[in-house]
Amino acid sequence: DWSSDVCSSDLLAAQAEGTSKLRRPLISRDSELMVAGLKQLGVKIEDSIENGEQVFSVTGGKLKGPAKIDVGNAGTVMRFLPPLASLAEGEIAFDGDPRSHERPLGPVIKALEELGVTVNHGGRYSLPLTLENKGIKEGKKIRGGEIEIDASASSQFLSALLLIAPSTEIGITAKHVGGALPSMPHIDMTVQMLRDFGAEVQVDKKANTWRVAPGKLIAQDLIIEPDLSNAAPFMSIAMVCGGSVTIADWPKQTTQPGDQLREILTRMGANIQFIEGGLKITGGEKIKGIDIDLHDVGELTPAIATLSALAESPSYLREIGHLRLHETDRLSRSEEHTSELQSHSDLVCRLLLEKK
């Protein structure tokens, strides 16, 4: 989800020299937890209104504990903040909602341990945990180096390491080892955000390797794009009810996975076009079924599943097994809601969810 972009920019701004301005940030529980966690680490963040728009002003500086950080059930917070906290002096404790204790975190913890950070997790490799980088007291940076990480359960594992790499002594070269890497567009977003802040990043996708060099980050003045994935339910209304819906400020060029909605919904029968000020979607006479690999855009699955339940032909939504490990089991929830839709309408739910 696009809250990861807000969280990534907050994280990089916390490491940068000067004060960054993040305009039009997405306000959600995830982003609020990230801001609260950064403040616990001593980061100065001011929330203001400029020309009618919300602005976060984030001033980089020395990170320090001790601190107790609530991650809620936010994947970005539980995976992005512990690596950042490893740059801080003092003991940092992390905990969250009961569901957060069940969500995968092991690859991030193991990577931090390889980097020399002490992480106390009771052998569970999950929350709750405390960490401390004892070398920080002596003025030493995390050395960095080559890390192998299995990010097949979440691309956030990889992004979390890349985001702190500029603040290490020799940078980080991260190699993904394991199954297919999900949500590649989110990693592309991380790389672009790093470059926006002045980091040097080399990418070799064939070798599943990302190299981020050490170096100073420079404060930025950024406009955060609207969350395109969140537009999916509203775009679906036009397809289900007829008529048109316009989404304001849809960017013509973006790395967001949600931009694939334009192609996907067109294949399902919608008419979609850019107009002045946004993107207009008009429903067709019928909703068409679709056979599609959603591995890179799993967050779109609930909306596509709902439309598929109302389609005139079967749909096959593939490579979405990793969604069982999100804030909720999104596959089970999608099955529940499409079944409810079937029981409350004369239409047959033709959705087949591939449980890989």
What are these regions (language model features)?
Residues 1-345, 350:
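Short, structured segments at the rim of ligand-binding sites
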Residues 353-355:
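Polybasic/polar functional segments that serve as interface/processing modules
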